[in-house]
Amino acid sequence: MIHIEEITKEYPTKTLFASASAHLRPETRVGLVGRNGTGKTTLLRMIIGEDTADDGSIRQRPWLKIGYLPQELATPTKFTVLQAVHRDKYPEHEAKRILSGLGFEEDDWNRKLETFSGGYRMRVALGHLLLSDPDVLMLDEPTNHLDKNTQVWFESFLMNSKMTMLIISHDTKFLDRIVTHIWEIRDQQLQECRGNYSEFQKLRLQLDTQQASAAQRQAKEVARVQKFVDRFRYKANKAKQVQSRIKQLDKIKVIEAKRDAKRLRFRFPEPTPSGKMVLELHGIRKQYGEKVVYENLDFSVARGQRVALVGENGAGKSTLLKILSGIL
């Protein structure tokens, strides 16, 4: 369906892909993995034409319908939830079914998007994408804004769909349950593996172990040959053998063992001593449209406390942080 052929993508300080190739086959569900910054999102954007490769090509059938959900989305807020999902193109009853699965109550369907949190707006965008039933569904961290119940429904939807999928996710359990193949971005290449994430991890460990052993054997052989060259370089009766060994060394393609990821070390500077009470809110009220988020809310944080802010999506967690920081 989609053929990625010998693509190269470079930036001034970094090369993401160097003659990388892969093929997305019909009705496969592929998890795209790799360290942060290796080019996962860039690859999706190149497939849909929002970015271009410096060399190589990405070919797809001309009739292919691709649906793409990025990590962040600017959803038009003038629509109601229901309008944003069906867009006067798709059956309303199907839109309602998907909205229910994504955690929207019937009372929510005719509310304006602007009254919802960013997480719920992403759910609306996801709902529209699922309703559009593309040939290829590409998702970038789709579970970030889903709670447990909606994720169960979402996974069931994907498993019962015949769409071909290319999914970026750091949720390895989600990948284990959903994908049939893994593409790993590694050493500027796309490496394909059949199976889910756990199966890929086992194979990757085996390959890394084999590569480390091969690198060690090669290093010993190079050292042995180099020792011969150094010892007999200036001996006339060994000149032919020395030249042969030098050519042998020149032809060797160095095997590199996998290096462990770099560990970042940092520390926060000591802050200026604060008062005993760091933050205080009294009688706070916040409303979006007709939706009341807080009513007579009291909140305080004392010096030295470490507070976890939890709640359902749309409960007002981000709004509270914005109020505390003075943005709202």
Roles of regions detected by a PLM:
Residues 230-232, 264-267:
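Short hinge/gating elements
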Residues 203-258:
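Intracellular alpha-helical coupling/juxtamembrane segments of multi-pass membrane proteins
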Residues 1-215, 262, 269-328:
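ABC ATP-binding cassette signature C-motif
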